[in-house]
Swiss-Prot record:
Transmembrane segments: 115-135, 181-201
Stretch list, region Disordered: 300-329
Protein name listed in UniProt: Alternative oxidase, mitochondrial
Localization of this protein: Mitochondrion inner membrane
Length: 329
């Protein structure tokens, strides 16, 4: 009888003992970043001993592509709709012709030096629009005290992604003084141009970037095709560590694999900016950014549908909407 009572007491006390032990263990564990660190005045003395890690060069929001899947990335073109779109398209085509001509890219055979120099220059420009758009939407959210609904993060991640393209290419080749000077001048011009343009017409800037990314996909597709056909034989076939970490590439990844993932990034920016331009055109710039759901959990797209509506129903309505939109494109 005594043993039965003892066993019941032990069984009843077990949860309390377990909770107490866990609490004590939790209390005993000092947090890595907590009040002790927050109450300090400076961490200046730690700067000389902080290790340099390539993984810290970017945020954790990194692209994850399947190499076989992105082999199917296609060259696409969205036809201009109206004066704003036409102006954006003509501007991009003019910029491409001027750059291809003065950089001599369109003359002679394709070489590794031409490709890397071209990418170095263009990626310094490509990282500007996302930062400008993200900054202005950030200021707008503060000014009007309203939620941004996911646009800012997508634009800033785009800017960071383009910068990581640049960080990769400078590991393959360091630009000379003339190229560095031209980059500084071009960046200043593009920043001021895009800043003013975004204040006046965000639709124009997003459409401009969409067409710019169309050209980028064309360029990178041409590079991949030249490698496949043997017209371009890369000597720098080892992918830099910063690229392997950022895109989660294997150690035996090739220069072609690198171009493949960068092309996929540009294709994503292409559809994102064309979508944002379409949203401005339809006065939906204050709506939720669809890519915050599409890229992470597409099933949520159907969670807000009326009761009884199925995924198939939503898809058919989406097809009708796309058809109607295409009539105006």
């Amino acid at each position: 009888m005594f043993r039965n009572h003892a066993s019941r007491i032990t069984a009843a006390a077990a949860p309390w003992v377990l909770r107490t032990a866990c609490r004590q263990k939790s209390d005993a564990k000092t947090p890595v970043w907590g009040h002790t660190q927050l109450n300090r005045l400076s961490f200046l003395e730690t700067v000389p001993v902080v290790p340099l890690r390539v993984s810290d060069e970017s945020s954790e929001d990194r692209p994850t592509w399947s190499l076989p899947d992105i082999e199917n990335v296609a060259i696409t073109h969205k036809k201009p709709n109206g004066l704003v779109d036409t102006l954006a398209y003509r501007s991009v085509r003019t910029c491409r012709w001027l750059f291809d001509t003065f950089s001599l890219y369109r003359f002679g055979s394709i070489t590794e030096s031409k490709v890397i120099s071209r990418c170095l220059f263009l990626e310094t420009v490509a990282g500007v629009p996302g930062m400008v758009g993200g900054m202005l939407r950030h200021l707008s959210s503060l000014r009007y005290m309203t939620r941004d609904k996911g646009w800012i993060n997508t634009l800033l991640v785009e800017a960071e992604n383009e910068r990581m393209h640049l960080m990769t290419f400078i590991e393959l080749r360091q630009p000379g003084l003339p190229l560095r000077v031209s980059i500084i001048i071009t960046q200043a011009i593009m920043y001021l141009f895009l800043l003013v343009a975004y204040v006046i017409s965000p639709r124009f800037v997003h459409r401009f970037v969409g067409y710019l990314e169309e050209e980028a996909v064309i360029t990178y597709t041409g590079v991949m095709r030249a490698i496949d056909e043997g017209r371009l034989r890369p000597t720098k076939n080892d992918v830099p560590e910063v690229a392997r970490v950022y895109w989660n590439l294997s150690k035996n990844a090739t220069f072609r694999d690198l171009i493949n993932v960068i092309r996929a990034d540009e294709a994503e920016h292409r559809v994102v900016n064309h979508t944002f331009a379409d949203m401005h055109e339809k006065r939906l710039q204050n709506s939720v950014n669809p890519f915050v759901v599409l890229k992470k959990n597409p099933e949520e797209m159907y969670s807000n549908q009326p009761s009884g509506k199925t995924r198939t129903d939503f898809g058919s309505e989406g097809a009708k909407t796309a058809s109607n939109v295409n009539k105006h494109v």
